[in-house]
Amino acid sequence: MIEHHPTTIYGTTIVTVRKGNKVVIAGDGQVSLGNTVMKGNARKVRRIGKGNVIAGFAGATADAFTLLERLEAKLEQYPDQLMRASVELAKDWRTDRYLRKLEAMMLVADSKVTLALTGTGDVLEPEHGVMAIGSGGNYALAAARALVDTDKSAEEIARKAMDIAADICIYTNHNIIVESLDAE
């Protein structure tokens, strides 16, 4: 569980949907410092590696960037092996005293697999092709799960889930960034 401190930058919602031949990660743009919105258009979803991996991060911003950089380094070490790179990052996360204190989570996906990298060094695969993290993660997850069996596309589901989360969660806004990849 991520504790909220008034002097730490927090807040976001990230959702991933894998459906049909697409995988999507969507996130909002709000950065909060305590109970103040510091920025509304942050980009917390992006392509990494050679552009064949998409990632979204939630939690303390500086910590999330540290983890993103570490994952990119692991992807260089293990090209086109997202699962292996993520497991190796998780090993480092659990054993490194500095990394263990990082308060962030990430959702990552390539054409084959979607994973959540948690603050405790766990690597999890989603059930039903849907997963969400962050302050509005539970709202986005519930919305996406409700829509995944409809005829909506992965991107439509992710956007609607983010809209619902932004309506409910004060740390999430409607400035939605979406990245997608073709899935196998």
Swiss-Prot record:
Signal peptide: none
UniProt-listed Enzyme Commission number(s): 3.4.25.2
Keyword line: Allosteric enzyme, Cytoplasm, Hydrolase, Metal-binding, Protease, Sodium, Threonine protease
Subcellular location: Cytoplasm
Binding site for Na(+): 166, 169, 172
Notes on activation and inhibition: Allosterically activated by HslU binding.
Database matches in CDD domains: protease_HslV
Protein role: Protease subunit of a proteasome-like degradation complex believed to be a general protein degrading machinery.
HAMAP family attached to this UniProt entry: HslV (MF_00248)
UniProt record similarity statement: Belongs to the peptidase T1B family. HslV subfamily.
Assembly information from the UniProt record: A double ring-shaped homohexamer of HslV is capped on each side by a ring-shaped HslU homohexamer. The assembly of the HslU/HslV complex is dependent on binding of ATP.
Name the record gives this protein: ATP-dependent protease subunit HslV
Protein's organism: Brucella anthropi (strain ATCC 49188 / DSM 6882 / CCUG 24695 / JCM 21032 / LMG 3331 / NBRC 15819 / NCTC 12168 / Alc 37) (Ochrobactrum anthropi)
Gene expressing this chain: hslV
